[in-house]
Amino acid sequence: MADERNGRGDDNGKLLYCSFCGKSQHEVRKLIAGPSVFICDECVDLCNDIIREEIQENAPEEASDRLPTPAEIRETLNEYVIGQDRAKVVLSVAVYNHYKRLRYGEGKSDVELGKSNILLIGPTGSGKTLLAETLARMLNVPFTIADATTLTEAGYVGEDVENIIQKLLQKCDYDVEKAQRGIVYIDEIDKISRKSDNPSITRDVSGEGVQQALLKLIEGTVASVPPQGGRKHPQQEFLQVDTGNILFICGGAFAGLDKVIQERSERSSIGFSATVKSQDDSKSTGDIIREVETEDLVKFGLIPEFVGRLPVVATLTELDEEALVQILTEPKNALTKQYQKLFDMEGVELDFREDALRAVARKAMERKTGARGLRSIMEATLLDTMYQIPSEHDVSKVVIDESVIKGDSEPFKIYASSDHAKAVPED
């Protein structure tokens, strides 16, 4: 039976100490006695924290035993990403097959399943990065983003491709096993395209050279990565990370790819068999991009071997006004919900009128920044109000309409007391 002692010695008046940390009974609040052993309240709390951390670490592994189906993956993507239905289907199937391959590979089989890395093609702000982030969060796997424009061949100024794996390791506290099941998103992949179709005598260290360096990493190799500290401690042994099970998702805007596809289409339909097209038959950029083929990507500047390592291609379309309005209001972490939460913390209700949301969407379309530009527009609109509200304790509601977004008027404030009441525009 455990005995609690609070500031008292034993029956003989002898001073008691915690058997774990060595503190005396006068230095702690409680000292619990067992058979010839004592533990203080601080050590009990520490033990509880250790057990709690271990339970939390093991919980994701237990929860991830069941692999979500492609339909379930798409459903989760729908909660955070608006539109891009075709890309979601392609991604859901590719990710499901990838992680099914990892589980299938754990058993013995004569059939070896190849890895299907993914290429996302779509304009800025269409949701490429968000799709990759959402997938990693849903599957509870380490995730990192790399910028292809900062990469160079080994030996040149810039980041080596191995730095990508080091970033992934940092995300999971250098747990190699976890990192080997992670997801890497390489952004701006179109910026490392070959400068020309013709071989050059000068080295292209940030273009074709990087593609060559990425080849083995994406396909699957054992990368040697310096542990924590990197070059500061060259005597440390390098960590060996097998990239064969890491899912690589590459994304880029590929500006001008539509023209490459059109040229190829026109070449294939020259002569008497060619169909005469009117101006009404002209396709949108999104429709043209959907017809992308391997030869178009090679013509654009990606080397054939690199394209071959990215067999799954998903195209994203430019977001229209309706989609941008949905992005502002519908996802779980929609921008309007975020700002409403911030105002709610001050005890103020924030109301966005429909015409205001459409004005924000139109402004983002004019800037050609897609969904990425929505936050900067909202921030600029609400900045002064967010500065004033904490000092104005009588405000109960703030209303934003189209005139506020255009900069023609200030946000409308409704005060709790009638002395400060101000007219609010009708819907």
UniProtKB/Swiss-Prot annotation:
CDD domains named among the record's database cross-references: RecA-like_ClpX (cd19497)
Transmembrane portions of the chain: none
GO molecular function terms attached to this record: ATP binding; ATP hydrolysis activity; ATP-dependent protein folding chaperone; protein dimerization activity; unfolded protein binding; zinc ion binding
The keyword Metal-binding belongs to this UniProt entry's keyword annotation: yes
Binding locations of ATP: 123-130
Residues bound to Zn(2+): 18, 21, 40, 43
Biological function: ATP-dependent specificity component of the Clp protease. It directs the protease to specific substrates. Can perform chaperone functions in the absence of ClpP.
Family membership noted in the UniProt record: Belongs to the ClpX chaperone family.
Quaternary state and interactors: Component of the ClpX-ClpP complex. Forms a hexameric ring that, in the presence of ATP, binds to fourteen ClpP subunits assembled into a disk-like structure with a central cavity, resembling the structure of eukaryotic proteasomes.
Protein name in UniProt: ATP-dependent Clp protease ATP-binding subunit ClpX
Native source organism of the sequence: Marinobacter nauticus (strain ATCC 700491 / DSM 11845 / VT8)
UniProt lineage: Bacteria, Pseudomonadati, Pseudomonadota, Gammaproteobacteria, Pseudomonadales
Protein's gene: clpX
